[in-house]
Swiss-Prot record:
GO terms for cellular component: plasma membrane. The keyword Cell membrane applies. It is a multi-pass membrane protein. Signal peptide: none annotated. Effector protein of a CBASS antivirus system. CBASS (cyclic oligonucleotide-based antiphage signaling system) provides immunity against bacteriophage. The CD-NTase protein synthesizes cyclic nucleotides in response to infection; these serve as specific second messenger signals. The signals activate a diverse range of effectors, leading to bacterial cell death and thus abortive phage infection. A type I-D(GG) CBASS system. The cyclic nucleotide binds in the C-terminal bacterial STING region. Comparison of structures from 2 different bacteria suggests that cyclic nucleotide binding causes domain rotation, which forms a lid and seals the nucleotide-binding pocket. It is found in: Cell inner membrane. This is CD-NTase-associated protein 13. It comes from Flavobacteriaceae sp. genome_bin_11. The chain crosses the membrane at residues 14-34, 45-65.
Length: 235
């Protein structure tokens, strides 16, 4: 089933054409059904099938295909966010958790920052978040993790009483969606581009974290990873 769904994602136009064809067929059958008695009388045609049942069956198919098409279109719209989430998890989060455990920590905690907008990931805002963490009596330091199968990465540690309380990361990979957002909004005819851009950014970020959370659950890491916003809820 997964292979079929993957194929449909790259050929969604087929679903669209089939749905359109079924709509046309359904419309024709409805007309025949409405004028069934006239057709029988004028053309002396005897219908051996239940036209009403056929219309109902085709209608169910159309609803199912339209729902599938809607899902495919949504996935196509947000596919860059999904791809980034997969890359971020496989190339950093999962190897980082693995390496930290191999270094001797039994139950490491990583808190991933969840912004509402890309601007929250600028260096100025990151410095502000770090200041807030310091005000919460955390001692901040950065360590370099040598990850197996991935490049080494720096990660922020939040320390209390000379012990590592948890790790903290800003997913700067989200900033690579800037150009995608600009492209999508520029290709739109909607005049309220700034408002639309803001909403689209929020949706992309939300989809990124939904996919990331899905991967976290699939790999049984819900006890190791949390999300927190600018109010630092979740630490």
């Amino acid at each position: 089933m997964e292979k079929i769904y993957t194929w449909l994602k790259t050929n969604s136009y087929i679903v669209h054409h089939v749905s359109t064809s079924l709509n046309i067929i359904s419309f024709i059958i409805v007309l025949i059904w409405i004028f069934e008695s006239t057709i029988k009388e004028k053309l002396n045609i005897i219908f051996t099938v239940n036209l009403e049942a056929i219309v109902v069956f085709i209608s169910i198919l159309i609803v199912g295909l339209n729902q599938l098409l809607q899902k495919l279109l949504i996935e196509a719209e947000y596919s860059p966010a999904f791809a980034l989430a997969v890359g971020y998890f496989k190339n950093f989060i999962f190897p980082a958790i693995t390496q930290i455990k191999e270094n001797g920590e039994v139950n490491p905690k990583i808190c991933i920052y969840k912004p509402k907008h890309f601007d929250e990931l600028t260096s100025t805002n990151i410095d502000m978040i770090k200041a807030e963490l310091t005000n919460k009596k955390y001692n901040l330091s950065e360590i370099n993790l040598s990850l197996k199968g991935a490049r080494a990465r720096d990660i922020l540690t939040l320390n209390k009483k000379s012990k590592i309380h948890s790790y903290f990361d800003f997913p700067n990979t989200l900033l690579s969606l800037y150009s995608y957002v600009d492209f999508k909004i520029a290709s739109s005819n909607n005049n309220s581009s700034e408002l639309k851009k803001k909403k689209f950014v929020e949706l992309l970020i939300e989809q990124f974290y939904l996919k990331l959370n899905e991967l976290i659950q699939e790999n049984n890491l819900t006890n190791n990873i949390t999300f927190c916003d600018k109010n630092l809820q979740g630490l």
